[in-house]
Regions:
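Active-site beta->alpha loop and helix N-cap motifs at the rims of alpha/beta catalytic domains
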Residues: 2-147
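Catalytic alpha/beta core domains of metabolic enzymes, predominantly
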Residues: 128-130, 140-219
Length: 219
């Protein structure tokens, strides 16, 4: 089932297990998925920052995504497809969706500085992967060095109907959640799922501000 703006609950951010020689540890992927399922997660996110995607070539990344997707039959799987080029992003996004992923996740590249650069980048990313693929907007300025204001996030979401979720990981970021939910109340922002990160450190407060759950993990 594809991800929608009504998504909520807990999505575990999965690490990618490796053997000592650098090969992907596929049996450990299966065990990770089984644990996430047993504890009641609603979904799993793979090949994110915690998933160490830059350590893999395109074939390995696709294989990891597919292994998670095929094992996680009762979970919605979100695949991180951020890349330095749109061709690689498109290839992994299409392969992941063909394998049964619920959505993909896209982060801004660290060189983006102005609001126009940020909004244009995501428009081009959607054109590259196809507007039929639901996607998660990753907002993690502490690591990615790209600051997206609530107004910029609103423009990205309104310009790209296939964006169904915000992975919110700003710190401090409570006012950002409040602002986005305020936009929805005044009709300037359509429905959008908001899941938060930061190790769930502020989850109680984030839920009070209108978050729909958490997308986070530990390794």
């Amino acid at each position: 089932m594809k991800l929608t703006s009504q998504a909520s609950g807990t999505f575990a951010i999965a690490p990618t297990p490796f053997h000592d020689d650098g090969r992907i540890d596929e049996s450990s992927i299966d065990r990770l998925v089984d644990v996430y399922t047993e504890v009641g997660c609603n979904g799993v996110t793979v090949l994110g920052i915690l998933g160490e995607a830059p350590k893999m070539d395109s074939a390995e990344a696709a294989a990891v995504a597919t292994r998670f997707i095929k094992r996680a039959t009762s979970l919605q799987t979100v695949v991180g497809v951020s890349a330095s080029g749109f061709a690689a992003m498109r290839g992994l996004a299409r392969a992941s969706m063909d394998a049964g992923a619920a959505a993909v996740m896209i982060a801004p590249t660290p060189n983006l500085r102005t609001d126009d650069q940020i909004t244009t980048y995501f428009k081009q990313a959607v054109e590259a992967i196809g507007d039929d693929i639901p996607w998660v907007l990753q907002d993690y300025p502490l690591t990615l060095s790209v600051v997206m204001t609530p107004a910029v996030i609103r423009k990205i979401v309104m310009d790209n109907p296939s964006c169904v979720m915000l992975k919110h990981e700003d710190w401090p970021g409570l006012e950002k959640i409040t602002a986005l939910r305020g936009f929805q109340k005044d009709g300037s922002l359509r429905p959008l799922s908001i899941l938060t990160g930061n190790g769930a450190t502020f989850l109680d407060f984030e839920m009070e501000r209108g978050a729909d759950g958490a997308m986070t993990g530990y390794a």
